[in-house]
Amino acid sequence: MFASTTPSEFNRALMAKVEVRKQQGLWSDAVAELGRVRTFALSEDELEGYYYQRALCSYLAADFEGALAAIDEARFALYDTVALARMELIEALAAGEKGDWERSQMAARRVVAAMPAEQQAEMEQRLNEIYSKAPRMRSPELAWWLSMVPGLGQLYAGEVWSGVVSLVANGALVTFGVGEIVAHHWLSAWLGAGGLLSTTYFVGQERARILTERRNQRVLREHNDLLRAELLK
């Protein structure tokens, strides 16, 4: 590659290296190599292959934002609608991984439109059912703020048992602290109940945020597993 005397020769050597990285399953490395391609020296056909490989390798490297960016660039750079159609499947899957259901469904519809006519109605019906059940992402930040009321953030995250435990634990500490104050045991109220309450309270807030993030990841993964299985049949 270092002996290449023209941009075209450099690109051919680089694309050969990309193929090696793909065969090795090193998708991130393949994306990095594609980033070195001198696109100004590519023909229309080569440019089509370049964007397709960038989108595909980015998706397989779990760089879904990168896959969608490659497809967006291809729409400006390519005039061949057939070439763009090759990327519709990647767009539907990558947008789904980002939780962009509207973009994902639009791309999936274009995938279905390219299928044989006798398959379209059934496939569209199954996809509509999947997209109708697309999960809504919950806000980790909102979960943190809701946890100012002990247990409420965990309930928002869908962790009922964790929320009940947090509510009971913090309630017990408050009850103990009030009892110690009434009994004029100021030191034990401050060091015991107060110290433990501050620990469980703030830990509970952070835990609610983490639980919400995990919930989002889980429902997103489950839904995209269904979508991928349907589109790759």
Located regions from the model:
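Hydrophobic alpha-helical membrane segments
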Residues: L26, E46-Y52, L56, D63, ...
